[in-house]
């Protein structure tokens, strides 16, 4: 359970953002829980409740085990059936862009909700990829996820690439898979070129995305952390706020 929010910490976070000319946001799974998407490591997270699911999130396991792929496709069908929508936390970050102070959004999320809320896609750096597309592990062809899901609905439990017959996966980064170097470089650049790094909904335990925090701090940025629980980077932050993101972000970003 999230403890009562200290209004003094909310005021401190508001003041930090209010005084910034360039704000970079680093977002994690906790931002999207109010959109009905469970996080991974929280008290009710996917991997907390089912540790075996974390093993199934490795690239080696996905490529080697057809049943893991079939289960992944079933999960993707369920994910899209939820029709997740942006929440007040996502919309608060859009408000930063409309104020003209948003340097960029570095997101560990794969749900596309920042763009759907209204953020300029060119400002959103999806370091862990996107579930809205598929990519063939063989030829690299990228296609809309909806095309593959139509094939799953028609009875193909593990649809192969139509171009080469290779293994198809969501265009997301699994454990053991390299990140896109250009996307990560852009994410680090946004973190080093801001007055305030506002991290929201991340435990800051997954690298290299978590490196954005010390890189921003080393470049002179103030770090504000808002999350539903303590993070591994709290010691680097000027303000640490344990709170419901959709409840406090509108005030912080409208400062």
Feature map (PLM): residue ranges:
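Conserved catalytic core of sirtuin-type NAD+-dependent deacylases
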Residues: 1-255
């Amino acid at each position: 359970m999230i403890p009562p929010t200290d209004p003094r910490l909310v005021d401190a976070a508001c003041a930090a953002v209010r005084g910034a000319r360039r704000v970079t946001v680093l977002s994690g799974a906790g931002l999207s829980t109010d959109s009905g998407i469970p996080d991974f490591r929280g008290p009710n997270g996917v991997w907390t409740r089912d540790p075996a699911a974390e093993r199934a999130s490795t690239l080696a396991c996905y490529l080697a085990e057809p049943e893991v792929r079939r289960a992944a496709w079933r999960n993707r069908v369920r994910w899209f059936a939820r029709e997740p929508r942006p929440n007040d936390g996502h919309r608060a970050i859009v408000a930063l862009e409309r104020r003209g102070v948003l340097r960029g959004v570095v997101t560990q999320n794969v749900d596309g909700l920042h763009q759907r809320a209204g953020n300029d896609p060119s400002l959103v750096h999806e370091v862990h990829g996107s579930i809205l597309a598929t990519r063939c592990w063989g030829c690299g062809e990228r296609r809309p996820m909806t095309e593959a899901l139509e094939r799953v609905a028609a009875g193909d439990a593990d649809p192969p690439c139509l171009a080469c017959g290779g293994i198809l996966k969501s265009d997301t980064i699994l454990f053991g898979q390299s990140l896109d170097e250009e996307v990560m470089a852009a994410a680090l650049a946004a973190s080093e070129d801001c007055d305030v790094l506002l991290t929201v909904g991340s435990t800051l335990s997954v690298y290299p995305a978590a490196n954005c925090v010390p890189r921003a701090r080393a470049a002179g940025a103030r770090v504000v952390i808002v999350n539903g629980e303590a993070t591994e980077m709290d010691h680097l932050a000027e303000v640490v706020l344990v709170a419901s993101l959709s409840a406090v972000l509108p005030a912080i970003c409208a400062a």
